[in-house]
Amino acid sequence: LNGKKVVSKKVEGSLVDIDHLTPDADFMKTFATQFEQGKKFTNDLVGKSQNTMESVPAFFGPSAFIDFIHQMQLQIGKAEVSFAAPLAMDAVIPEGNIYVRDMFNLYRYENLLYVMNLTGQEIKDYLEYSYSGWVKQMENKDDHMLLFRDNPEQYADAWQRFQRPSYNFDSAAGIRYTVDLTKPTGQRITILSMADGQPFSLTRTYRCALNSYRGNGGGGLLTQGAHIPESELTKRIIWSTEKDLRYYLMQEIKKQGTINPKPLNQWKFIPEDWAATARQKDEPLVK
């Protein structure tokens, strides 16, 4: 304060443990009906899965977890290429019954699904930017593979160990490509073909499925990576869902009844022996 005038201020927040507190009885009584309705909804059966889906493997290559989302996005959006990232560090959806509550592990945020027009060059640049924040340039097979902060072991929570948020680690489906861990940023991605073996062209325009956070510029993959001006992003959108993506994922699972999620194996890190060795070192730091 300078007299009665505020000249500067600083606000800090922190998480507070409230487990030891007793909930207010009037509050609990007032909202008891809504609480029971919400609990019933999250316990509703959506379908069944023949395999366990985990998010941790997604940091090291194709995974059933992310590739199921890719498959759904390609199908729902009638797209040629899909982009998706692990939205949770340690999500697990066990084999067996899938309930509504599990869908919040599979897809945490209230994003719409967009389909946007991107050129082949923009797709490559998008992926270069994604992996630039995901993996480091390895000098030998004993290096870390993931782009951690210095001394990652000092951080208690796995998400704090990364230099960039893991929800910006987009991989792609619909195309076959490699990510060279020995190359610098901008030279890592080699797109071999479309997933069906058809040629991939840097000059052709493709229908690309991605969530609305990403499509509106979130994470910078479109603006800083693909070099699309923010003012142009809305012009690239050619289709959008009306409801959140989780709703459509639920509808697809209900429609199929039983799903069998497996990795699509459309991309990989190379050299493969370096990636395998680095995974043994890095995976404990992701859990």
Show where each model-derived region lies.
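Catalytic centers of hydrolytic enzymes
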Residues: 1-287
